[in-house]
Amino acid sequence: IMRKGGAPVLGNRGAEAWDLGDGVLGFTFKSDYNSIDDNVIAMIHQAVDRAEKDFRAMIIFNHGDNFCVGANLMAVLGAAMQKQWDQLRKMIRDYQYGTQRLKYSTIPVVAAPFAGTMGGGLELCMGSDAVQAAAETYAGLVEVGVGLIPGGAGTMNMLWRSLEGVPEGVDPDVYGFVTQTFKN
């Protein structure tokens, strides 16, 4: 990825935002395995703020073996074992708000996933205006496999997408849409 300048315009231990030129802000993870943690979540909010103020678009891209392996479940487990419920609630709420900020941003947001795009990584893509996925992209809301409900608005975005084809003014029985959306 071509970057303008020698340093990111924003950054912390979990993620960075770079000026890519042509009015585009690039957002990339620095966390272990491109996992989502408090630092990544904080940087999502800062990057959207900066992009809406100083840029015309934002692209989410990553380096490494996978686009994103989802939430750092070891950090989640550690917080749960220490009964840090308020910290967990805040992390989930901030991430949900972050993915929704992408969705409702005043600038277009494009995600460029590749390889493993799991859990929260897929939810980032679902919150984006457009997705340019690599041919070998394997995506899923895999949290269910460890007994968790996806927490970054992914299930809501799946349901909204299933309702997009319903004509305006029609009041459908949404049960059929819900079961079809979540049956797999």
Describe these PLM feature segments:
Residues I1-S31:
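Short beta-strand/loop segment at the start of cytosolic alpha/beta domains
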Residues D22-T28, I41-D86, R93-A112, A134-Y138:
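A structural preference for short, pocket-lining loop segments at secondary-structure junctions
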Residues S31, G64, S162:
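A broadly conserved detector of short glycine/acidic/proline-rich loop/turn motifs that flank catalytic sites
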Residues L88-I92, Q96, Q100-N184:
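Conserved catalytic cores of soluble enzyme domains
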